[in-house]
Amino acid sequence: MLALYQAYGLDMFKHLRGEFAFCLYDEEKELFIAARDRYGIKPLFYTVASGRLLVAAEAKAFLPLDWQPEWDVKSLVEGGWNFDDRTMFKDVKKVRPGCYMTCDKDGNIEHHRYWDIDYPDKASCSFLGFAPG
């Protein structure tokens, strides 16, 4: 991941395939990056506790870092934990599949989609290519 980021910057996501969830910190740009694979196979959660951005593969990793779990009843009832960036816990969000988030030195968090199901495939083919004989 580091080599891809050094070569392509945030365009690195065009070159990634497979399962992943990772975090990078660009010291020069003072930019934190957290990313998740296209299909969301690998989990990645985040929250802000005591003025700090916390990111982990499991929400329980936040427990020793001043995070107090509280059920998000609305998310549970609406199924938001399954269909959007909400989780079962208040103020804990998911990095969505096919997305990455950035956080600058001022704590500004931005979300970016690098892939979705409508993303054009590099290998194009037609129905006739699959038709027999």
PLM-predicted stretches and their roles:
Residues 1-133:
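Cysteine-centered catalytic environments shared across enzyme families
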